[in-house]
Amino acid sequence: MFSRLLNRGNGGVNKNITSGLLLRRTTTTTTRLSYINNSPTLSIRSFCSKSTTITSDEKLDLSGYTTDRIRNFSIIAHIDHGKTTLSTKLLSLTGTLPKSIYGSGEDSLVQKEKSEERREQYLDKLQVEKERGITVKAQTCTMKYRNKEDGKDYLLNLIDTPGHVDFSYEVSRSLMACQGALLVVDAVQGVQAQTMANYYLALDSGLEVIPVINKIDLPTADVERVKQELKDAFGFHPDDAVLVSAKTGVGITDILPAVIDRIPPPQEPTKSPKVPFKALLFDSWFDRFRGVICLIKVVDGKVKKGDSIVSAGNKQTYEVFDVGIMHPEQRPAPSLFTGQVGYITPGMKTSKEARVGDTFYMKDFPVEPLPGFQPAKQMVFAGIYPVDSLDYTQLRESFEKLMLTDSSISMTNETSVALGMGFRCGFLGLLHMDVVLQRLEQEYGQVVIATPPTVPYRCLLTDGKEILISNPAGYPSAEHLSKTFEPMVTGHVTLPTEYFGAVVKLCMDSRGILTNQETLEGNRTRITFNFPLGEIVTDFYDNLKRISSGYASLDYEDNGYQESDVAKVRVLLNGEEVDSLSAIVHKSNAQRYSRSLVKRLRKVIDRQMFQVNIQAMVGSDVQARETISAMRKDVTAKCYGGDITRRRKLLDKQKEGKKRMKQMGCVELSQEGFLKLMKSTNDDD
């Protein structure tokens, strides 16, 4: 049948059928009667299978958008201030969202609510983002917009960024592709810690910042107070703020005209008849069919399919297989021009080749590389092990696939006596670690055991050599150690004044040193502490939210290393060290930590036929000890009287047997026991 269709002349119908077959698209057409303005209309809807093949007629021509009609901007804010909802509203305003997520006028109320929810979370692609209601990965989208003031069409490139401090690296690299930013502030909560951190990131990048006060529809919104906070904190004039409600759509139409009017266009191209191509790589992800897809900002020249480009970082040459923009999904275009943001498919096989901050240029026209980014710096390390040791290979493959979309993770092989083979992984923060573990389970079906998070310590040895320790098991012994330096951070806590005493006590208990205190508008205070990173990567943030009823916010940045009096706490079971339970703690906290640990261990270790001694030691000093008594068999049960020496003989024989068993026996902490220990640690927190 298929061959007959191909051999039937060039009639219109047969030609169309042949084209459809060559495109490998399965299309079903249905006819339905719908009502528009209370009048029946006949609509034809086509449902296509998931094929990414797009004909050349569907490609966008971007050559008409000169740099003066292009605006590149990000949306930055503190977590949960409404960035993604606002971004999706702008996509809806410009007609960029696909119609399939809108629903029809005949949909039920439940269907409409689901449609509304899909629209609000459209830019949150990952399942973990939708479940937690947070943005983890920055998302890019290009919008076409006709400005009513001058009647011109503009190309607006929007980047929705994360708000949590763990993902500030995503924000910083996104800002490098922009000339401006919308600083979104909650009309109820006002300026928070991450609001200030993101503002200064934008300021350091030389961006024009437009303040946007969101959620003005809430009954508790205080717009005038937030305007004053923006003025005091950043120097904005009260009239500079755009007032909106991303939920209801109030004021949304004022944002894009402000973007066009106040954010400068990309720089003019070099005045030359042949401008050499130069582009900045600011993001990438992996597609198993097409390889690495790179998001770029074209600084000069243009790039099209078939061009040969060179990476300034690794000096390798790549052929461009595809070019396009995110509108909102991948949409092919003949070329990308100066000032435009889009994607290219250069045929890279691994994401390691796509180094964020790299410069691309044409093969025969080398250029000066652009200023790049600082690589992501891992702040928290943990051991990750499969629940079943047979799943080690699958876990490694799953991690490698995940790292293709998140290059900020580091991974090295590690072996534990208790848990077997696994990995020592580095993360940007505790939330980042939690998100990665959740993605491993949801996207790859890998349930893992994670050891307590640690931070990297610098150790100066007696021979003058300096080493970096991220695994407590590798901490050097006292006779080989000269000094230890622990990582420090500068933490900024913004809180209502009524919680000041409790928050300061929490910071002091976490070995924080107060360096600054500032009174803000609206009965709020901002305090600055120098913290050891190891004190705040576990339960500090949760405790801060608990004692402040959720109103306090935290932001922190790296502050180098500082000499510290820390020690390694070793755990011994009948004299045998369990490496996976080792920890590095400050000596002032060593005894309290040790007592808590051995008590929890006593609950999860099964009783043996011999006595089990649990010890927590620092050097040769025992900090805490617990004993699990042996199970005892009543060997005298068969004695019904008679000489007492018979009973003593049986008891002495049992005692001698237990002594030999203790010498030869081995106490093992099972994976189930280790998992219970980790859960009890979280419960205690």
UniProtKB/Swiss-Prot annotation:
Q: Which cellular component, as a GO term, is one annotated location?
A: mitochondrion
The record's comment on protein family reads: Belongs to the TRAFAC class translation factor GTPase superfamily. Classic translation factor GTPase family. LepA subfamily.
- Record domain tr-type G: where: 68-267
Under Gene3D superfamilies, the record lists: 3.30.70.240, Elongation factor 4, C-terminal domain, Elongation Factor G (Translational Gtpase), domain 3, P-loop containing nucleotide triphosphate hydrolases, Translation factors
Species in which this protein is naturally found: Dictyostelium discoideum (Social amoeba)
What function does the entry list?
Promotes mitochondrial protein synthesis. May act as a fidelity factor of the translation reaction, by catalyzing a one-codon backward translocation of tRNAs on improperly translocated ribosomes. Binds to mitochondrial ribosomes in a GTP-dependent manner.
- Where does the record say this protein resides? Mitochondrion inner membrane
Ordered alphabetically, the record's keywords are: GTP-binding, Hydrolase, Membrane, Mitochondrion, Mitochondrion inner membrane, Nucleotide-binding, Protein biosynthesis, Transit peptide
Q: Spell out the Pfam families in the cross-references.
A: EFG_C, GTP_EFTU, GTP_EFTU_D2, LepA_C
HAMAP family attached here? LepA
An example GO biological process term is: positive regulation of translation
Annotated GTP binding sites? 77-84, 160-164, 214-217
Q: Where is the transit peptide?
A: 1-54
Q: Which GO terms describe its molecular function?
A: GTP binding; GTPase activity; mitochondrial ribosome binding
PANTHER family tied to this protein: TRANSLATION FACTOR GUF1, MITOCHONDRIAL, TRANSLATION FACTOR GUF1-RELATED
Q: What is this protein called?
A: Translation factor GUF1 homolog, mitochondrial
Say which enzyme class the record assigns: hydrolase
Instruction: Say where the protein is mainly found.
Output: mitochondrion
Membrane topology value: Peripheral membrane protein
Q: What EC number is given for this enzyme?
A: 3.6.5.-
CDD domains per the record? Answer: EF4_II, EF4_III, LepA, lepA_C
Q: Supply the gene name.
A: guf1
